[in-house]
Structure formats: C-alpha cells, structure tokens
C-alpha cells in the first residue's frame, strides 16, 4: 500500500478560481494551503537575507529569477516536509500530512526544480489545471470586487458593496481593466503551455473544466482525485482491504 501523503499543485489562468478552489480543497481534505503569493508578501515584510534579495529585484521593477523564487518556495516546502516526517512517525492520518501549492511553478525551470523535490518526498503528487475560456476570464475579472481586509473575492451579480465577512467596503483591483486582463491572458498562455507540456509528459496533469460554477468545479476536482482519496481512506482505516477477493 502506498502511504505517501497527498500533494497537489493547482494551476490556471487569471480568474480561473485557483485561490477559491485551493481554499475549498484545503478545508475539505485537511490540506495545508501554500500560496507562493502569500510567501512572497510575507518575505518582503521580513528582514532576512532572502527578503533583501527579493526586495532588490522588486525595487528595480525586475522579474524574480527562477532560482530566487525557488529558494522562497523550497524553504516552505522543506519546513513542511520535515513536519510531515514527524507527523507520520506519530501515525497521524494521511490528510494531516498533505498540502496544496498555489501560484507555483510558472516556468519549466521552476517545474523541474519542484519535481525533483517532490519526487523524493511526495512521488504521487498531482497537478490540477483549471481550464477556462478567455471569454469567461474576461467576464469574471471585469466584474470582480476584492475585500482589502480578508482578500475575499466577489462579483457584481452577488450585489455586495461591502464584505459580508468583515464589513469592509469592496474595491476593484487596479489591474482588472480590459487591456491589462488581455495582456495577462496572453502572458499566461506563453509562460504556462511549456509547463503544462512538461507535466503532461510526467503524467501528472489533471484537467478540469473551470467554466462551470464554483461548487461544480470543486466536485469535478474531487471526482478526479477519487483514486487518491480512496488511498487516503484505506490508510486511515489501517485494514487489509486489498486482501479481499
């Protein structure tokens, strides 16, 4: 029986629902949600050699090198992996040793670095692609509102003027304009297709239709992960289910 923990990577175009689905999966499956965006924002607020190196690039308006982004993500993954080993020695369930990574990798170089790490500790990891049309991306992002306090995302159809969770007035992101969105879509396609090709070759990719409503997309992901979840349930019961005829 394969007892390796569940590790998921979630990818998709801007507006595909990566953050929303990551949070739903983290809650439903007891996964640690690792967001590269959160890691970057956290690093910038600190005073460490790594954060200073990151700030030097950002202050100059330069893109962070693959190796530097990997340092940031690897630091968190290494911490998680060490904690996972301790939890597994305590015979905790698989779900308590599992995680979902959002916002990384963005390049083939990053994907290769990540694959090398995961192959050693989480060999059965999967990559979830939220596949969404350009039209749906435009529809979602041009009608999107953000809570500046909790980062909750809402749309015009919901009719909220303030966040229902923390009562803060909702705002529009400055980059949610048609011109910027079209540019982001094009950049995403150029950068991401080689990464998707890489994961397809590695037989890691699970493609989900993300044009559907949130809960329908979520259920599609769960259905696609059913084999992994069956392993999880069997690990938890510690029985000899495989010995049955």
Swiss-Prot record:
A Pfam family per the record: ADK
Region of interest: NMP: 35-64
EC numbers on record: 2.7.4.3
Region of interest (LID), ranges: 143-176
Pathway: Purine metabolism; AMP biosynthesis via salvage pathway; AMP from ADP: step 1/1
One term of GO molecular function: metal ion binding
InterPro entries: Adenyl_kin_sub, Adenylat/UMP-CMP_kin, Adenylat_kinase_CS, P-loop_NTPase
Gene Ontology CC terms, in alphabetical order: cytoplasm
Protein's GO biological process: AMP salvage
Entry keyword set: ATP-binding, Cytoplasm, Kinase, Metal-binding, Nucleotide biosynthesis, Nucleotide-binding, Transferase, Zinc
Residues annotated as binding Zn(2+): 147, 150, 163, 166
UniProt binding sites for AMP: 36, 41, 62-64, 103-106, 110, 173, 184
Subcellular location: Cytoplasm
Catalysis performed (reactions): AMP + ATP = 2 ADP
Binding site for ATP: 15-20, 144, 153-154, 212
Subunit description: Monomer.
Domain notes: Consists of three domains, a large central CORE domain and two small peripheral domains, NMPbind and LID, which undergo movements during catalysis. The LID domain closes over the site of phosphoryl transfer upon ATP binding. Assembling and dissambling the active center during each catalytic cycle provides an effective means to prevent ATP hydrolysis. Some bacteria have evolved a zinc-coordinating structure that stabilizes the LID domain.
Function: Catalyzes the reversible transfer of the terminal phosphate group between ATP and AMP. Plays an important role in cellular energy homeostasis and in adenine nucleotide metabolism.
Family: Belongs to the adenylate kinase family.
Name used for this protein in its record: Adenylate kinase
Organism: Chlamydia trachomatis serovar L2 (strain ATCC VR-902B / DSM 19102 / 434/Bu)
Lineage of the organism: Bacteria, Pseudomonadati, Chlamydiota, Chlamydiia, Chlamydiales
Recorded name of the encoding gene: adk
